[in-house]
């Protein structure tokens, strides 16, 4: 019913999957109604703060990047954002001393663990959520993403790849903190070997390895340990979508549907929703309780 922040700083460090740069991160407590704010501690002055919002998303190639008017950015935020929203952390200041969040093991599980160690503190402000009132959909060829009214948060996703290592996979899950922990948090990002080589030629994927991603070569999975789940690929895409939705600034009560969607389409959906005030409203759990009495 109430907003929460972290009880103590959540500290972690690692390499960025694209920059290869080693960065240190501290997720610190923040006042009620702050939302999620990234602070680049390696940038001096007042231009180092980035308040997360749909408009702050400035790039979506292979990850979600947020930035401010001064051009200061932080990339690959989606896994941490998914962990924050699903663990009920509404307000936090995320200090990072470089341009990219650490990829850790490629999933959200390391973030869940550090947030668990930090704990959560209840704040004296009602927790808000975004209730979906009418369907909103964006389509790009055979790709689509949609938000529809529902009694609770639900996530459905479908992917189709020519590689037999992936094929067609689909999930449809009611999503709360327990489901996120049990069904999605440990599912890793993935990529094809030939794409990794091309990305590195473009200056990307410099930190990518089988330590932080599932790597596919043709129809083979190269990671010696294999998959954590048979449908790990589609589950990770659902994890990404949850993180991308949280740039709205509050959890969603509604049904998300994604077909072949990526970060770009997810953000297009968020912006389309924001542009449709008839399709959503901000509610608080306190209001719901009062109406139920």
Curated annotation (Swiss-Prot):
One biological process term in Gene Ontology: lipid A biosynthetic process
The protein's name: UDP-3-O-acyl-N-acetylglucosamine deacetylase
Any Pfam family the entry gives: LpxC
Organism (species): Phenylobacterium zucineum (strain HLK1)
Signal peptide boundaries: none
Catalytic activity, reaction form: a UDP-3-O-[(3R)-3-hydroxyacyl]-N-acetyl-alpha-D-glucosamine + H2O = a UDP-3-O-[(3R)-3-hydroxyacyl]-alpha-D-glucosamine + acetate
PANTHER family in the record: UDP-3-O-ACYL-N-ACETYLGLUCOSAMINE DEACETYLASE 1, MITOCHONDRIAL-RELATED
Entry-linked HAMAP family: LpxC
Job of this protein: Catalyzes the hydrolysis of UDP-3-O-myristoyl-N-acetylglucosamine to form UDP-3-O-myristoylglucosamine and acetate, the committed step in lipid A biosynthesis.
Catalytic EC class: hydrolase
Family classification: Belongs to the LpxC family.
InterPro entries: Ribosomal_Su5_D2-typ_SF (IPR020568), UDP-acyl_GlcNac_deAcase (IPR004463), UDP-acyl_GlcNac_deAcase_C (IPR011334), UDP-acyl_N-AcGlcN_deAcase_N (IPR015870)
Its EC number(s): 3.5.1.108
Source organism superkingdom: Bacteria
Annotated keywords: Hydrolase, Lipid A biosynthesis, Lipid biosynthesis, Lipid metabolism, Metal-binding, Zinc
Molecular functions (GO terms): metal ion binding; UDP-3-O-acyl-N-acetylglucosamine deacetylase activity
UniProt pathway: Glycolipid biosynthesis; lipid IV(A) biosynthesis; lipid IV(A) from (3R)-3-hydroxytetradecanoyl-[acyl-carrier-protein] and UDP-N-acetyl-alpha-D-glucosamine: step 2/6
Cofactor(s) demanded: Zn(2+)
Residues at the catalytic site: 263
GO cellular component: membrane
Positions annotated to bind Zn(2+): 79, 236, 240
């Amino acid at each position: 019913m109430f907003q929460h922040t972290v009880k103590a700083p959540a500290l972690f460090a690692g390499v960025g999957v694209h920059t290869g740069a080693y960065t240190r991160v501290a997720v610190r407590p923040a006042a009620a109604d702050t939302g999620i704010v990234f602070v680049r501690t390696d940038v001096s002055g007042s231009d180092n703060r980035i308040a997360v919002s749909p408009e702050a998303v400035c790039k979506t190639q292979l990850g979600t990047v947020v930035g401010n008017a001064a051009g200061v950015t932080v990339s690959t935020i989606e896994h941490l954002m998914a962990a924050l929203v699903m663990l009920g952390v509404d307000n936090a200041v995320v200090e990072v001393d470089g341009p990219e969040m650490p990829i850790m093991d490629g999933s959200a599980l390391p973030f869940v663990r550090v947030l668990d160690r930090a704990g959560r503190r209840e704040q004296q402000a009602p927790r808000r959520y975004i209730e979906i009132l009418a369907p909103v959909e964006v389509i790009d060829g055979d790709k689509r993403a949609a938000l529809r009214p529902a009694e609770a948060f639900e996530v459905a996703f479908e992917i189709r790849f020519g590689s037999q290592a992936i094929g067609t996979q689909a999930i449809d899950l009611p999503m709360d903190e327990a489901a996120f922990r049990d069904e999605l948090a440990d599912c890793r990002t993935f990529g094809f070997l030939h794409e990794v080589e091309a990305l590195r030629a473009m200056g990307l994927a410099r930190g990518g390895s089988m330590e932080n991603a599932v790597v596919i070569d043709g129809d083979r999975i190269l990671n010696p340990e294999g998959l954590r789940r048979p449908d790990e690929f589609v589950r990770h895409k659902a994890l990404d979508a949850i993180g991308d939705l949280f740039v709205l600034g509050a959890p969603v009560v509604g049904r998300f549907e994604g077909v072949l969607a990526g970060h770009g389409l997810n953000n297009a959906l968020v912006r389309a929703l924001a542009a449709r005030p008839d399709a959503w409203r901000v509610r608080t759990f306190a209001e719901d309780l009062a109406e139920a009495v």
